[in-house]
Curated annotation (Swiss-Prot):
Name of this chain's protein: 5'-methylthioadenosine/S-adenosylhomocysteine nucleosidase
Catalysed conversion reaction: S-adenosyl-L-homocysteine + H2O = S-(5-deoxy-D-ribos-5-yl)-L-homocysteine + adenine; S-methyl-5'-thioadenosine + H2O = 5-(methylsulfanyl)-D-ribose + adenine; 5'-deoxyadenosine + H2O = 5-deoxy-D-ribose + adenine
Keyword Metal-binding attached: no
Active site location: E12 (proton acceptor), D198 (proton donor)
Amino acid sequence: MRIAVIGAMEEEVRILRDKLEQAEIESVAGCEFTKGMLVGHEVILLKSGIGKVNAAMSTTILLERYQPEKVINTGSAGGFHHALNVGDVVISTEVRHHDVDVTAFNYEYGQVPGMPPGFKADKELVALAEQCMKEEENIQVVKGMIATGDSFMSDPNRVAAIRGKFENLYAVEMEAAAVAQVCHQYNVPFVIIRALSDIAGKESNVSFDQFLDQAALHSTNFIVKVLKELK
């Protein structure tokens, strides 16, 4: 099976790239694609760059050029739920934009005109990820909504504003909704699996740097477990 894994930054893809066998690297429009084999699957690892435009552009190239059967977006995120801690993992059930507002024209907050209000992750991939999480003992793994915007959430006032827009929001980051929207348009199953590098609004600029490597390791290990179970 051909599986695409997307991470925004070098820190988020480096560990997984080192695990790929027969790796071949290709650069297209500033995006790094690494093809290789891992646990019996052909894996296309994309380093997309940070933010929604980079994520949308590179995911489009990915789907057109490599035609993966499934897409997994990995990396770090800011935790938005009071019960979560740094290093915990969030599996997406739904992904939304948190910086889109066309409510003046009767769209839901976060809804892009012509698109659904949110993008549903593939139920089979979510269930598989949830099954894999049962083996985790020292890391809390939850499933829920992830929201995306082109901002790093270090301002408590902005955090409070976003919390007021979405119920049961578990994490925020800067690429997932763009990846999900492109996958929706191409009808390619996707899931977002993010490890928390910080808790939004609580000294985010400090804890992000401190815990990014830990979050990347947790996320990568979890991705490998999911790949092992994919049939």
